[in-house]
Amino acid sequence: TVLRPATVTVAIDAGATHSLDTYLSPLFYDGMHLRIGFERQRASRFNPERWTHKIEAGLTYDNPSNPAGNNSLHTIIADVDFAMLHRWRVAQGLTLHAGADIGFRGGVTYNPRNSNNVCSPLIRLYAGASGMAAYRFNAGRLPMTARWQATLPVVGGFFLPDYDQSFYEMYLGNYRNTINFGFWH
């Protein structure tokens, strides 16, 4: 029997956001960002010595305000990401991982001051590359892992309506510039 240990991480992120949603407003909004995230990484069944898979999921809440400070947006986003990573043991305690990933982000931004378009849907699908470096060490008798990771979307699709374009127009068939395809070029 081959051991397939799993690493589970729960993280709480807090910080700042600088956002622009041109469907709701032509202005940049700055403010608070909160996220709770979950990650599970485990050695794969087919080759546990060299391959791992990673699943990440999270829930984000942003509450930025406009430059005048008299209006704020409320954004809720859920995301999920799956990656298959090849693992190389470079040195004692140091491993490098590289592979492909796919992901989804979906949510809504609400602007309480707008009368016609009060919310903006956020839908993104992507595929890309992922990399990670992990170093295991002991701090006294406590085992620790320091890790750096990056995900780079390569290709994707997203829903992005134009400023002041109503959902009624889209319902009638005017999808101009609402569903977009993105890639490196």
Regions found by a protein language model. Name each.
Residues 116-185:
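Outer-membrane beta-barrel transmembrane domain signature
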